């Protein structure tokens, strides 16, 4: 543990080592931290000691634990976005449990419409994400999002089932500033109705919007379909 301070308790030495690795970029923002077993072997200590070090990193917001997945490097804007009322925090505040399932991820050309929307070339790539948001295991909304790849190099490497898209944008250097949205009601297709445990033709709340950064650059187009009985939750993505 060459880069540790010897007069500190072992778990604090390890915490400092891991924090320094995060600061240096050895563990990039959004990436998974090695497992407790791997770290215990590396530092020649017990899992309990590693867990104590990780607990401190969680408290400081430098990492986030996700059950069944592991620990991920957090971001300095995390607390701010949670306070802004994101899906995860809004649901947690209600006493329920949120989860996100990634249905599909791909890249596609912008084409004329989205090139004009984002101010990019028609042959520039968009990162397309389709997600299912759940509360206590029950599906409540489907969201389709398009993001210009040239604005967020490496976005496909962030686990967006762990980090919200707004957190991800911050991680990659662009802070969302404002959104222009419109609300409507539409009948669900058979595919979307099946995902939401509804019948084809049932009505859903539709929110479509464009998000901008502080410079006025459009960074995200999103469209979501939400079950009417989930309307008690207010959140943005």
Where are these regions (language model features)?
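N-terminal leader/targeting segments and the immediate start of mature chains
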Residues: 17, 58-59
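Alpha-helix C-terminal capping/helix-coil junction sites
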Residues: 22-23, 58, 170
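Beta-hairpin "wing" of winged helix-turn-helix
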Residues: 26-31, 60-68, 74
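Residue cluster at the C-terminal edge of the helix-turn-helix DNA-binding motif
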Residues: 42, 59-60
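Short, hydrophobic-biased segments on the C-terminal half of alpha helices
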Residues: 54-55
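All-alpha effector-binding/dimerization core of bacterial HTH-type transcriptional repressors
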Residues: 75-237
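Extreme N-terminal segment that seeds HTH/winged-HTH DNA-binding domains in transcriptional regulators
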Residues: 1-45, 93
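Residues in the helix-turn-helix
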Residues: 49
């Amino acid at each position: 543990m060459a880069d540790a301070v010897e007069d500190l308790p072992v778990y604090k030495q390890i915490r400092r080592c891991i924090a320094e690795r995060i600061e240096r970029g050895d563990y990039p923002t959004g990436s998974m931290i090695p497992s407790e077993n791997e770290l215990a072997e590396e530092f020649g200590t017990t899992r309990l000691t590693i867990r104590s070090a990780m607990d401190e990193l969680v408290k400081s917001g430098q990492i986030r634990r996700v059950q069944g997945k592991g620990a991920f490097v957090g971001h300095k804007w995390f607390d701010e976005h949670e306070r802004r009322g994101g899906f995860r925090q809004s649901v947690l505040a209600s006493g329920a449990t949120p989860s996100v399932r990634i249905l599909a991820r791909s890249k596609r050309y912008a084409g004329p419409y989205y090139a004009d929307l984002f101010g990019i070339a028609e042959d520039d790539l968009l990162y397309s994400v389709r997600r299912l948001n759940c509360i206590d295991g029950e599906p409540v909304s489907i969201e389709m999002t398009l993001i210009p790849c040239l604005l967020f190099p490496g976005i496909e490497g962030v686990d967006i089932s762990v980090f919200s898209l707004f957190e991800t944008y911050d991680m990659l250097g662009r802070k969302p500033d404002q959104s222009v949205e419109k609300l409507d009601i539409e009948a669900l297709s058979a595919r979307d109705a099946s995902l939401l445990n509804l019948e084809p033709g049932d009505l859903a709340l539709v929110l479509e919007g464009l998000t901008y950064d502080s410079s006025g650059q459009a960074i995200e187009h999103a469209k979501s379909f939400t079950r009417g009985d989930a309307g008690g939750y207010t959140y943005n993505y």
